């Protein structure tokens, strides 16, 4: 069709019992948009939820040892949660990918451990960190239908032959990788979907930032993909303030800034953004 649709789902941020309303919203969104891929952009797991109390880690660098029994229990709880919010995708045969936010790790599991668990579920296309420099994500058949990373059709049926493939670009950081989207003839990349692990917390306070390795990976991507990319990450960029306009606190649609910007209220700057944008 020449079209490729991405559905982004952010901040599910639930414990082991995912809200029925959340699952219903995911189902309705999938049916309304019929995406080719879904990207979960962080904070899928509310690591601070009481269910994870025995393995809770407030900051990644906390040195207190967590008993293996608690971690093992948490792994099962995480599997239970993931199974609930990815079930609508599995039943519809929609592939998906995830990156991480500032609360996922607080359950006590590292992003690498979470990545391993996510890959157990049907439809997940997260690559092993620093995997093969070139890895198949989609195989384009003569009829144009895609074959997913694990060799199954999008509907979960058996493997079939393919006529070409697109490369996946993994990195050393779990949750950071690139998915090139090819044209209908599978001859060239026309778009890159880039997931970035944007960090969680900084030692000096406040939120963290992407690692130097992640930034180096991103810097090399334009030449490797050869097409413009869309980037998906959890943490908003400070540069977002460059497309906002300060207004009075009682102005229509005004939103309060954060931390050093907390004394100012903003709306989208119409001269720097496209029509139809939303700040909220």
Annotate each predicted stretch with a short phrase.
Residues 61-228, 248-260, 265:
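Extended active-site neighborhood of metal-dependent phosphoesterases/phosphodiesterases
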Residues 1-84:
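N-terminal active-site segment of His-dependent metallophosphoesterases
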Residues 30, 37, 45-53, 232-257:
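Short, solvent-exposed beta-strand-terminating loops
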Residues 7-10, 38-43, 96-102, 231-233, ...:
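Active-site neighborhood of phospho(di)ester-bond hydrolases with catalytic His/Asp-centered motifs
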Residues 229, 233-244, 258-280:
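Beta-propeller domains
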Residues 22-23, 53-56, 111-115, 245-247:
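Short, glycine/charged-enriched secondary-structure capping and boundary segments
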Residues 3-13, 190-200, 232:
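Active-site-proximal beta-strand elements of phosphoester/diester hydrolases
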């Amino acid at each position: 069709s020449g079209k490729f649709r991405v559905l982004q789902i952010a901040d599910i941020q639930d414990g082991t019992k995912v809200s029925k309303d959340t699952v219903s919203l995911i189902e309705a969104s999938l049916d309304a948009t019929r995406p080719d891929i879904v990207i979960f952009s962080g904070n899928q797991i509310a690591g601070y939820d009481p269910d994870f109390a025995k393995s809770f880690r407030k900051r990644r660098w906390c040195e207190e040892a967590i008993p293996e029994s608690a971690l093992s229990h948490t792994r099962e709880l995480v599997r239970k949660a993931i199974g609930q919010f990815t079930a609508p995708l599995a039943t519809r045969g929609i592939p998906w990918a995830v990156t991480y936010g500032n609360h996922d790790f607080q359950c006590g599991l590292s992003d690498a451990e979470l990545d391993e668990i996510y890959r157990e579920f049907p439809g997940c296309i997260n690559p092993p960190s620093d995997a093969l420099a070139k890895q198949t994500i989609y195989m384009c058949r003569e009829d144009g239908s895609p074959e997913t990373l694990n060799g199954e059709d999008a509907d979960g049926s058996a493997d079939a032959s393919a006529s070409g493939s697109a490369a996946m670009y993994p990195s050393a950081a779990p949750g950071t990788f690139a998915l090139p989207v090819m044209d209908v003839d599978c001859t060239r990349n026309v778009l890159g979907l880039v997931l970035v692990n944007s960090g969680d917390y900084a030692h000096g306070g406040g939120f963290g930032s992407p690692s130097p390795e992640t930034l180096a990976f991103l810097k090399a991507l334009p030449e490797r993909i050869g097409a413009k990319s869309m980037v998906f990450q959890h943490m908003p960029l400070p540069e977002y303030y460059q497309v906002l306009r300060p207004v009075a606190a009682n102005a229509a649609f005004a939103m309060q800034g954060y931390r050093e910007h907390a004394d100012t209220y903003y709306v989208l700057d119409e001269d720097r953004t496209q029509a139809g944008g939303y700040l909220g």
